[in-house]
Design a protein with these regions (language model features):
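C-terminal motif of bacterial Sec signal peptides marking the signal peptidase cleavage site
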Residues: 17-19
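Pro/Thr/Ser/Gly-rich low-complexity, intrinsically disordered linker/stalk tracts
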Residues: 23-58, 111-120
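Short, conserved beta-strand segments of beta-strand-rich sandwich/propeller modules, principally
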Residues: 49, 91-95, 155-157
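Short beta-strand elements bearing conserved aromatic residues within extracellular beta-rich modules
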Residues: 50, 66-68, 166-168
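Recognizes extended acidic, P/S/T-rich segments that occur
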Residues: 54, 61-91, 97, 101-108, ...
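Beta-strand-rich ligand-recognition modules
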Residues: 78-85, 170-200
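Low-complexity, Pro/Ser/Thr- and charge-rich linker/hinge segments at domain boundaries
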Residues: 115-138
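Aromatic-lined ligand-binding clefts that engage carbohydrates, nucleic acids, or primary amines
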Residues: 147-150, 154-172
Length: 200
């Protein structure tokens, strides 16, 4: 009986340790966001904020450490540091790995993306377009330009700035779901812009 009890206690202890480790391995970072947005495009910050949640069977999971890895290719991610320089008009891939309160590594998240836009005025190559009317002229101006692309486009972005509101159409289809973009501001001090993915 003594040998059986000893064997039973050892088996339970071993099972308990393995179960705890297995439980932590099931904890995975989910709902990855950049600047509180999912898969955003048009971020104009060189130091974006990364956030995520935890999904797993452990109710009171507490992470002791996390590591964000980032890169321009999902197959070549490097540890993210505060002094890392992000480039404008670039898609970045990132994921996060966490360690539990005991220092054991947990699952790595799936890879998320974000895309930078313009960081400074010199990143702009477009020029302002306007009608010749005074600002008191009430009818809203409409601008139209026809052009033909000489090659296939892999990806396309449109950056629209307006001293007021705009609606953008390409091939007769309205671009974007929002109205009253790019939003009100003091137009004598700053002009906002919106980024659209118009690849399709």
């Amino acid at each position: 009986m003594v040998k059986k009890n000893t064997l039973l206690i050892c088996s339970l202890a071993f099972f308990s340790l393995m179960g705890c480790k297995g439980k932590n391995e099931l904890t995975v970072p989910v709902n990855l966001r950049t600047e509180y947005l999912r898969e955003p495009i048009g971020l104009d910050t060189k130091s974006p904020r990364f956030t995520w949640e935890y999904k797993g069977s452990e109710k009171n999971f507490l992470a002791s450490r996390s590591e964000i890895r980032i890169g321009t290719s999902p197959d070549n991610l490097q540890p993210y540091t505060d002094n890392m320089t992000l480039e404008p008009h670039t898609r970045y891939y990132w994921n996060v790995t966490v360690w539990d309160q005991d220092g054991d590594i947990c699952e790595t998240s799936e890879t998320a993306t974000f895309e930078t836009a313009k960081f400074k005025s010199s990143d702009w190559s477009g020029k302002w377009i306007t009608d010749s009317h005074d600002k008191e002229f009430e009818p809203a101006p409409m601008f139209r330009k026809a052009f033909t692309l000489g090659k296939e486009i892999e990806e396309a972005r449109v950056y629209v700035a307006a001293a007021g509101y705009y609606d953008l159409f390409i091939n007769g289809k309205r671009v974007g779901e929002n109205y009253l973009d790019p939003g009100y501001t003091h137009f004598d001090k700053r002009i906002l812009y919106v980024t659209h993915d118009v690849t399709s």
